[in-house]
């Protein structure tokens, strides 16, 4: 009887050739940023603090560099728009708009981090965190102690960001899963402009 080892070895080699390994997560982050001048995606968000969970969902749109629209549709309506200079936060239920300089708020929003060309690399030290399931993960730790997020994890597949996990200075753990992503589709400039509706309170967050 012939030994099975050569056959098993050949099968393993063939399997490896048929399913090449993904690039590292850091390399995929760079490819994701450089390869998507615009991005639109649905998202589902879960925030956990001391055992309590809050879930929300909505839509993200990005136009690099620096413009984004992060819109919550469930369970409440909230709109966050970065027009490149000013960050606008519109709480419809409160009839209130908060306005602040976008540059000062880059570290406080996942969308702001994603909309820049290299904001994450500029503000965080990146390390490979290995593969879990079918995602390659990186771990990002802040270079400065006053950053809003104390830790960020990002999971990629085929140069596309699938999931973010963030821990902030208040002890909140946030998990964001992206779906229905479209890269480099035309997005109207009006999507990244905001004018406070009549009758709402406008406060400065600077």
Swiss-Prot record:
Localization, UniProt: Periplasm
- InterPro entries, sorted: LolA/LolB/LppX, OM_lipoprot_carrier_LolA-like, OM_lipoprot_carrier_LolA_Pbac
Secreted in keyword set:
no
Q: Name one Pfam family in it.
A: LolA
Which biological processes are named by the entry's GO terms? Answer: lipoprotein localization to outer membrane; lipoprotein transport
Task: Give the NCBIfam families listed for this entry.
Answer: lolA
Q: What is this protein called?
A: Outer-membrane lipoprotein carrier protein
What does UniProt give as the signal peptide span? 1-23
- HAMAP family xrefs: LolA
- Look up and give the organism this protein is from: Chromobacterium violaceum (strain ATCC 12472 / DSM 30191 / JCM 1249 / CCUG 213 / NBRC 12614 / NCIMB 9131 / NCTC 9757 / MK)
The annotated subunit structure for this chain is: Monomer.
Q: Which GO terms describe its cellular component?
A: periplasmic space
Q: What is the lineage of its organism?
A: Bacteria, Pseudomonadati, Pseudomonadota, Betaproteobacteria, Neisseriales
| The family this protein is said to belong to | Belongs to the LolA family.
Q: Which UniProt keywords apply?
A: Chaperone, Periplasm, Protein transport, Signal, Transport
State the function annotated in the UniProt record.
Participates in the translocation of lipoproteins from the inner membrane to the outer membrane. Only forms a complex with a lipoprotein if the residue after the N-terminal Cys is not an aspartate (The Asp acts as a targeting signal to indicate that the lipoprotein should stay in the inner membrane).
